[in-house]
């Protein structure tokens, strides 16, 4: 039992900075929305539309680069730190390649925006220009993620948190300058948020690069001239590990976007109640997501040490801690759901619906915690293909169709509206949790030689 308490402390020490880093990242989006809204409602809407396209694209690249964390953790655990710099260097190459792809997609996203039903031409043009300003930050964001994943793979999660808050602090004044046109800069309105955010991502990258170069604990991780060359087998291996995670993230983000579109014809009250509940549950999701990142680091490190039993301990402890946190957040949600809804809106109908949906959110928080931490465990084992198949089946084969049937048809019961989609979320996330646990148990029952051979690839 003692080893589980020790492991829990290690996991929390890694997870807590990740929680704050995620809060800082989320706050940047909130700041953009609020400051654009202060300029005009049209500019705020343009930022919202642009962000809805930016997020799936950039999270695809983000997920691809998550392959670095278990690779570096495994090398660190096995004492092969001399090989880490080469992996990081090839990570930069992969980030550069995917950046070009993302920038091309975002540059041509105007076709999607202008094709939206009944969209105002002025709003559409602002959204397009916002994206075309923001896309220049894609390389900076992904290069920052390479260095952040390097640090996290070495069990150093504090730098990512620090850079997140530096980015947030820089974002506010730079937004102000470009939105309202101060210090000789043009007045760009909502488009200025795109310019500011792109600039901030580059600032975060250069600050992280400066920290890594100065960190005493990383002085032995310096790229040799030979490691600066393209190593296509390494790049291909990183892509093979990261691609399923990238697609899983993409499917998750697009799922919620599709549900929002399906709910939108139901009326203002239904849309507002759904959005409030979704926003709050996303905030609660930060806790298990951070624990997932910590578990990936610990499992990868233990496998690098050649200890499959200790890797199992890390995995089990992560799941247990995640369930405990989910129980606490679920109780908090149940008890305070009405006051929380009132913070967003004072319309009685909206508050009633949002509080009802938050009750459903409380039900799935435990299964959501298990599935996302299970995903982190599988990343640590470098078994990422199963993550893709599990999330695709759970979200798109089970969750969305069942939500559509319950929410918008009378095939099973009378149409339930947004609540039907939330029952779909419960089914999808619970199915994902069960499949993640089954896959984890399957991997852990394999011979140690097989597990370690997979981890060393």
Curated annotation (Swiss-Prot):
Keywords: Antiport, Cell inner membrane, Cell membrane, Ion transport, Membrane, Sodium, Sodium transport, Transmembrane, Transmembrane helix, Transport
UniProt GO MF annotations: antiporter activity; xenobiotic transmembrane transporter activity
Matching InterPro entries: MATE_fam, MATE_MdtK, MdtK-like, Multidrug-R_MdtK
Compartment(s) of residence: Cell inner membrane
Parts of the chain that traverse the membrane: 11-31, 53-73, 93-113, 127-147, 160-180, 188-208, 243-263, 276-296, 316-336, 357-377, 387-407, 418-438
GO BP term (any one): xenobiotic transmembrane transport
UniProt topology in membrane: Multi-pass membrane protein
Function (record text): Multidrug efflux pump that functions probably as a Na(+)/drug antiporter.
NCBIfam families: matE (TIGR00797)
Name recorded for this polypeptide: Multidrug resistance protein MdtK
């Amino acid at each position: 039992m003692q080893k589980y308490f020790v492991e829990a402390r290690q996991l929390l020490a890694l997870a807590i900075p990740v929680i704050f880093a995620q809060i800082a990242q989320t706050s940047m989006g909130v700041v953009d929305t609020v400051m654009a809204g202060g300029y005009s409602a049209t500019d705020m809407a343009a930022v919202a539309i642009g962000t809805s396209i930016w997020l799936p694209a950039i999270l695809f690249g983000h997920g691809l680069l998550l392959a670095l964390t278990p690779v570096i953790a495994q090398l660190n655990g096995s004492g092969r730190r001399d090989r880490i710099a080469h992996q990081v260097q090839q990570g930069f190459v992969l980030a550069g390649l995917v950046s070009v792809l993302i920038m091309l997609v975002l540059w041509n996203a105007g076709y999607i925006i202008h094709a939206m039903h009944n969209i105002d031409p002025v709003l559409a043009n602002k959204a397009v220009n916002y994206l075309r300003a923001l896309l220049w930050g894609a390389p900076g964001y992904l290069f920052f993620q390479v260095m952040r994943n390097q640090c996290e793979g070495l069990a150093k999660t504090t730098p990512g948190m620090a850079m997140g808050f530096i980015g947030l602090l820089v974002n506010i004044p730079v937004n102000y300058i470009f939105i309202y046109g101060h210090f000789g800069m043009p007045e760009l309105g909502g488009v200025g948020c795109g310019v500011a955010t792109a600039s901030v991502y580059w600032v975060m990258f250069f600050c992280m690069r400066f920290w890594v170069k100065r960190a005493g604990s990383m002085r032995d991780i310096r790229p040799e001239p030979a490691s600066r060359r393209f190593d296509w087998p390494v790049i291909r291996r990183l892509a093979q590990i990261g691609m399923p995670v990238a697609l899983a993230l993409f499917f998750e983000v697009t799922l919620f976007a599709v549900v929002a579109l399906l709910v939108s014809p139901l009326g203002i009250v239904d849309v507002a109640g759904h959005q409030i509940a979704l926003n709050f549950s996303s905030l609660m999701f930060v806790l298990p997501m951070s624990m997932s990142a910590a578990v990936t680091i610990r499992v990868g490190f233990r496998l690098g040490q050649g200890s499959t039993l200790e890797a199992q301990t890390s995995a089990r402890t992560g799941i247990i801690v995640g369930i405990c946190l989910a129980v606490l957040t679920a109780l908090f949600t149940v008890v305070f759901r009405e006051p929380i809804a009132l913070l967003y809106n004072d319309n009685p109908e909206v508050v009633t619906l949002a509080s009802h949906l938050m009750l459903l959110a409380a039900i799935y928080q435990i299964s959501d915690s298990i599935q996302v931490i299970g995903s982190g465990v599988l990343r640590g084992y470098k078994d990422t293909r199963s993550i893709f198949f599990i999330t695709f089946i759970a979200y798109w084969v089970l969750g969305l169709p069942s939500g559509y049937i319950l929410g918008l048809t009378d095939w099973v019961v009378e149409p339930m509206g947004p609540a039907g989609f939330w029952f779909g979320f419960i089914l999808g996330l619970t199915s994902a949790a069960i499949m993640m646990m089954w896959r984890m148990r399957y991997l852990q029952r394999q011979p140690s030689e097989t597990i370690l051979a997979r981890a060393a690839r």
